[in-house]
Structures are given as structure tokens and as C-alpha cells.
Amino acid sequence: MTSSQPYTLTQLGWKPFFQQQLTLEDYENTQICRIVAHHRSGYQLCSEQGRFHLAIHHAQPKMTVGDWVLLDEQQQFKRLLERQSELSRKAAGSKIAEQLIATNVDTLFIVCSLNDDFNLSRIERYLSIAKEAHIEPVVVLTKADLSPQAEQNITQVQQLSATLWVEAVNALDPVSVAALQPWCAKGRTVAFIGSSGVGKSTLTNTLLGEETQQTGGIREDDSKGRHTTTARSVHMIPDGALIIDTPGMRELQLADCSEGVSETFAEIETLAQHCRFKDCQHQQEPGCAVQQAIDNGTLEARRLQNYFKLLREQAYNASTFAEQRNRIKQIGKMYRHVQSDKQKLKTTY
């Protein structure tokens, strides 16, 4: 969002879902803003009144690009509006924390290049996150000219789900990228997600019609991309949609994502209902409908193994998040107890 001119709420993606959360007092005494950039120093906000910078404060809730917030008359944070959707992952590394990627997104463009980066299991991981957030996923395949197996790879992605939208585009060609326009109508918010170097920033620039995002090349030795986007930000394209370009992710672990995994691998869970034993582990048990599907070629063994992997990952991370929340809750109780004892001592004296 590089223009200094104010935007209407409709242009910023305002919907009845958010309007229903406001009171008459909110309309009269607050400014409705959307977070369009998130930096270490704070948030960049856009509203009908213009642009604002909001410093990060420990008393604020965790926020990110896409959030709607209310500011008071002094342009200080007042309230975060409930989110319509929330993209998140487990924070990278050993840290036990959930990291917000973007919020209030209508469509998630899962970008994957058809070179050595192509990985069906990674696409399934992204699909699980999108479905958990109730966001429409669209798989965007780039760099088909670099792969002799492009057509085969495109078919493999299409076979992941009969209802999955898959578009193969040349990220540098506006005519080719026009295939994404049905999801880029005025007031809609779309986000790009994918590994470094797959073409997210190039796609953003092509949709914008200008070189707004820096782009980087691919290392020839391993086809790995270089980080070019280092912070999440919102851009408005000529068609009126808002685009969130996210940094490339070398690590994407699931947080609490059981519903998303179930939806992504729905056919496996349907098959499991026909196993002879209710507690079937889908390994070597007799009468296993899942293993039978693998034997007759209607289910990939790779897909089943990835299903198991994502189930284990999300179950472990969900339990660690729950333990952390319980610890924080206990610390809060202890703090309130100590404060209560201090107050009693004061009244005694």
C-alpha cells in the first residue's frame, strides 16, 4: 500500500462480518484501520482517514497483517476485531509458540515451482493449514518451462482433490497470470505462501503491474530460492484485490490443525470407516480398507505416510501448546494470589 491517499473501507476489504462487531460509540469515537504491514518497530495501518504507525506494546494482543483494529481519538490502540480467518504455524525452531502468518484472508495462493522445489507432501501441508483456517486454497504452479515433467506434476496436484483449483502460470507474463483474476476481485484479500524463490514476489509484481517487491534468483546447484521478501505487507492491485506477500518459509510446522488435516486427507478417513477393526492402524491388519486401496492403486503410499506424519506433528504441537497455556494460566493464578495477599497485608496495617 504505497499510495498516501486514504482508502475506503470497502477497498480495504471491509465486510459485514466486521461491521456487526461495532457499536454506535465505536462509529462515533474510533477510527477503523487495517494492518497493512508488520515490522519490528510496529504496524503500518490504513484507514479512511489516512495512514498511521502503531508501535508494538506488550499490553496489545498479538496482531499481524490483515487484522482490523480500532484506534481512539489520540490514535492509540483500543480494540482488535474478531478475525474471519487466521493463518498460523508453529514458530520456527524449538520455540513453543504459534506464529501468525496473516488474517482475514479470502483465498490462499499456494505457490510451488515445477523445478526441484516441487513436492506434493509440502503442498498437502499448505492445504491443511488453509483448510484449518477455512480459507479457499488455490495451487499456483510456476516455472513449468524448467521442468520436462511439468504436465505430469500438474496432473499429480490435480489428483490431490477433485475440488482443488490448480493454475499453472508464467509469473512474468501478465496474460498468463490473468488466470488468477477470478480470485482477485475488488475488496477481496488474497495471500501468497510458499518456499523462497518459487515466484511469489514475481507474481505480486506482475499483478500490480510494477516492480514493488524485490525478486531474487535460484541457486543453480540445488534449485533453492533466495529470500527476497523479509516482511509481510499488503498491496492493492488494479483489479481492486488486496495481496499479502509473505516471506519464503524454509520450515512450516503445523500448530493445532486436526480439522485441516482431516479435510485434506478426507478420502483416507472415509476408507478407514470400512476397515474390519475400529482401532485399525492401517499397517498390516487384516481387512484394512486403506491398505487395500494402496494395493489396488487408488491411494498412494506416499500420501498415507504424509497423513501419518502430519497427524503426529499436529498432535504433538497441539499438546505442547495446551501445556504452555496451562502453565501461563497457573502463573496468572499465582500472581493474582500474591497480589491479593499483599492487599490483605496493607489493609491489616
UniProtKB/Swiss-Prot annotation:
Enzyme Commission designation: 3.6.1.-
CC cofactor: Zn(2+)
Molecular function in Gene Ontology: GTP binding; GTPase activity; metal ion binding; rRNA binding
Function as written in the Swiss-Prot or TrEMBL entry: One of several proteins that assist in the late maturation steps of the functional core of the 30S ribosomal subunit. Helps release RbfA from mature subunits. May play a role in the assembly of ribosomal proteins into the subunit. Circularly permuted GTPase that catalyzes slow GTP hydrolysis, GTPase activity is stimulated by the 30S ribosomal subunit.
PANTHER family (UniProt xref): SMALL RIBOSOMAL SUBUNIT BIOGENESIS GTPASE RSGA (PTHR32120:SF10)
Biological process (GO), any one: ribosomal small subunit biogenesis
Binding of GTP, residues: 142-145, 194-202
Localization terms from the record: Cytoplasm
The protein's enzyme class: hydrolase
GO cellular component: cytoplasm
Organism, scientific name: Vibrio vulnificus (strain CMCP6)
SUPFAM superfamilies listed in its UniProt record: P-loop containing nucleoside triphosphate hydrolases (SSF52540)
Free-text comment on the cofactor: Binds 1 zinc ion per subunit.
Keyword Acyltransferase attributed: no
Highest taxon above the source species: Bacteria
Domain CP-type G positions: 97-252
Protein name: Small ribosomal subunit biogenesis GTPase RsgA 2
Family (UniProt): Belongs to the TRAFAC class YlqF/YawG GTPase family. RsgA subfamily.
Quaternary structure and partners: Monomer. Associates with 30S ribosomal subunit, binds 16S rRNA.
Sites where the protein binds Zn(2+): 275, 280, 282, 288
Keyword annotations from UniProtKB, A to Z: Cytoplasm, GTP-binding, Hydrolase, Metal-binding, Nucleotide-binding, Ribosome biogenesis, RNA-binding, rRNA-binding, Zinc
Main localization (coarse): cytoplasm
